From Swiss-Prot:
Enzyme class: oxidoreductase
The name this protein goes by in its record: Ketol-acid reductoisomerase (NADP(+))
Residues at the active site: H108
Cofactor requirements of the protein: Mg(2+)
Residues that coordinate or bind NADP(+): Y25, G26, S27, Q28, S51, S53, D83, E84, V85, Q86, G134
Positions annotated to bind substrate: S252
Amino acid sequence: MARLYYDTDANLEPLADKTVAIIGYGSQGHAHALNLRDSGVQVIVGLYPGSPSWPKAEQDGLMVKTVADAAAAADWVMILLPDEVQKAVFQGEIRPHLQPGNVLLFAHGFNIHFGQIQPPANVDVIMVAPKGPGHLVRRTYQAGEGVPCLFAVYQDASGMARERAMAYAKAIGGTRAGILETTFREETETDLFGEQVVLCGGLTALIKAGFETLVEAGYQPELAYFECLHEVKLIVDLIVEGGLEKMRHSISNTAEYGDYTRGPRIITEQTRAEMKRILAEIQSGQFAREFVLENQAGKPGLTAMRRREAEHPIEQVGRELRAMFSWLKK
């Protein structure tokens, strides 16, 4: 089993008298910036001129500068931007201002692991990745708790990179819950695999296939939506709270029996073989190259797929049914 590290295993000393630039002020950016500030760290937010997040960050009491100015003023730079824009921003606005001994941080290893960003040899390169959305990272911190984090070291120029990563994780509240050491490679490859095979790609394909099967068999689309999409949250909440065991303890015997006897007929040996092929594409860099080329071309494929998926019948049915859900309007 992996070892978890807690508050007593880390200290904030590496952050003493240091300025941290948080590049981006989205879901993770606002949580990191505010938690760091509340932990006594000097924080600057780096944004592009005219960013709608600029006044919001200022209203939150933070100093805001352009990305280049923030990078120039900081000792530590955390890049919390979409994967596809990080390379250009790093090359044009961050790299020219990095000084020996600085710390370059990421919350996902994609651009480092796949060579899109090649940092200078005289800076530490580390990762701190909360395993939860930004609003949860912030809310739990304010409640005196935290969200578990992964941390990793890619480049240790100072000899203190590991301690620095743990200090940052502590400052955003991670060590209150526990932090797990990993590598950029492991985090990147497992994250992409989980997204593609289970959480996003696998789940949405399963939901749509179930919906389509019922509708094609003559059942009302509304019932198909309830059974194949709406109730997913009910099951997932049980799994998150107590694992598969709690979910199976909470459902009916009929549902549990169907789980054991029919589930394996959906995830077959052929499905598992395809999972392995997808993992191999991630490990080889094939997916990363494909994604980079897609973005360089202006995202024509992604745009077309978004448009096509938005027109799926399940979306129209869902919009109509969700209008009935009063709890979603609160």
